Amino acid sequence: MKRIAVLTSGGDAPGMNAAIRAVVRKAISEGMEVYGVNHGYAGLVAGDIFPISSKGVGDKISRGGTFLYSARYPEFANLEGQLAGIEQLKKHGIEGVVVIGGDGSYHGAMRLTEHGFPAVGIPGTIDNDIAGTDYTIGFDTAVNTAVEAIDKLRDTSSSHGRTFVVEVMGRNAGDIALWAGIASGADQIIVPEEEFNIQQVVKTIDDDFKKQGKNHHIIVLAEGVMSGDQFAQELKAAGNTSDLRVTNLGHILRGGSPTARDRVIASWMGSHAVELLKQGKGGFAVGIHNEELVESPILGSAEEGALFSLGEDGKIIVNNPHRARLDFAKLNRSLSR
């Protein structure tokens, strides 16, 4: 394999630039040429493809976001979009692709491989919700950003004797809420993976103020449960009498310079992705399990360890989906009382 491409797709995540840098420099060290694709699959279809040199990634490891830009491009799920992208790959003489992103990005990589273009996936999303890996690029930075913000909110919360609901990203997974909640000493953590009783939440708030003598209360809420504003309304309807404020950390969690861990993991994964292409292992994704690099086929059966399989209706099924550490929720309950 003499020429490969790299693209980022879906939501941006701190550490994506470190992964791109590793792909470029590892590939060049192996005698390959590397091309970047701007704006993900949309840029692939449009032919927004250009050569990248080792010097071109020299100052990127510390930068957040992705200098290749990113976009969601659902049209790539259609055969027409896939064939248009493949035509551009052929036009540029590209023989393999590294795709950095989440589940949707992996689906695109799977389709490219099915059409004869080897593609390897690298998990890049702050939500940490990808099957086949314990850890996704951007998660550590997002958690640290959330903790820093919650620590500051605690200062103002305790100054005024208030309850704060802090909404964090996590549409399908509560990992950011769990990790940030524990690290910041939150009083309650609400995640999609665990049922909650709104009356019990209100009782815990009351007990903290009236029985425990606390002068503030912090609730970390994953967005996949409901919005912070809706949660506040439900608290009020359930009888909450404390002075309540809602803060949505939102997209701030995606920004900022990546942590050392995100930079190292991204570099490790990026380098290994090139090794997989070199070995002809298209259709695989890189991951981390028990602090070791692992690789999983993107499409196949659950028994084969594949990330996805196809149902009888042709719809994509997630095999062994990522599960949040709910034992962390139990840990937080024991530490916050």
Swiss-Prot record:
Active site: 127 (proton acceptor)
Residues holding ADP: 21-25, 154, 185-187, 214-216
Classification via InterPro entries: ATP_PFK, ATP_PFK_prok-type, PFKA_ATP_prok, Phosphofructokinase_CS, Phosphofructokinase_dom, PKF_sf
Major site of localization recorded for this protein: cytoplasm
Record keywords, A-Z: Allosteric enzyme, ATP-binding, Cytoplasm, Glycolysis, Kinase, Magnesium, Metal-binding, Nucleotide-binding, Transferase
One GO cellular component, as annotated: 6-phosphofructokinase complex
Documented EC number(s): 2.7.1.11
Recorded catalytic activity of this chain's protein: beta-D-fructose 6-phosphate + ATP = beta-D-fructose 1,6-bisphosphate + ADP + H(+)
Cofactor dependency: Mg(2+)
Residues engaged in binding ATP: 11, 72-73, 102-105
Pathway in which this enzyme or protein is active: Carbohydrate degradation; glycolysis; D-glyceraldehyde 3-phosphate and glycerone phosphate from D-glucose: step 3/4
GO molecular function, one term: fructose-6-phosphate binding
PROSITE patterns registered for this protein in UniProt: PHOSPHOFRUCTOKINASE
Binding-site residues, Mg(2+): 103
Residues reported in the UniProt entry to bind substrate: 125-127, 162, 169-171, 223, 245, 251-254
Regulation: Allosterically activated by ADP and other diphosphonucleosides, and allosterically inhibited by phosphoenolpyruvate.
Location(s), subcellular: Cytoplasm
Quaternary data: Homotetramer.
HAMAP family linked to this entry: Phosphofructokinase_I_B1 (MF_00339)
Family statement: Belongs to the phosphofructokinase type A (PFKA) family. ATP-dependent PFK group I subfamily. Prokaryotic clade 'B1' sub-subfamily.
Known role: Catalyzes the phosphorylation of D-fructose 6-phosphate to fructose 1,6-bisphosphate by ATP, the first committing step of glycolysis.
Name the record gives this protein: ATP-dependent 6-phosphofructokinase
Gene that specifies this protein: pfkA
